[in-house]
Amino acid sequence: SYEGKLKAWAALGANLPTRLVDLEPLTGDLTLEGHRFELKGGPAALADRHYLWQAESRALLGGVLLFQQEHVWVADTPTPDDRAAWIDLLDEMAALQPELVVPGHRLPGTAADASAIAATREYLLAFEEELDKAADGASLTEALVGRYPDNGMRIAAQIGAKVAKGEMKWG
């Protein structure tokens, strides 16, 4: 719920959202200044996960599917099957061989290239590996922070770990 997310995001302080915005989903391709952006993704397992591909410029707008030097937000994909479907989408993105890649979440100054696809994929695989070894959410968080000490958005590691270990409901 919105209220639950506000409570979970309290650590954002002044950056905490102050209002709920109703969004209208994009259901097809988008044209901007004569350039067509293809709406891709959204497989049955992750029907709400899409990205935009602009073939002419070889540009990919990854949205919530891509992270660069941030802990990956996995709370919305609580099962191994969800995360496997995400990895499949990342493989689909990589196969396009994009030259410009814009992740939905990244630290300032990070590269705007396909390394975000590889980084997100590697993190998801590491998450599964550490999940199998961790006794609880706290130990999973510790393992993820240990593997990615310079990544931002630690709250993503904390909440994702709790959700994956069944200690917290999300969404």
Residue ranges and their predicted role:
Residues 1-118, 122-129:
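Metallo-beta-lactamase
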Residues 10-29, 52, 62-80, 155:
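Short, charge-rich amphipathic segments
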Residues 1-11, 36, 95-100, 107-171:
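Accessory terminal helices/loops
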Residues 16-22, 28, 53, 101-102, ...:
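Short flexible/disordered coil segments
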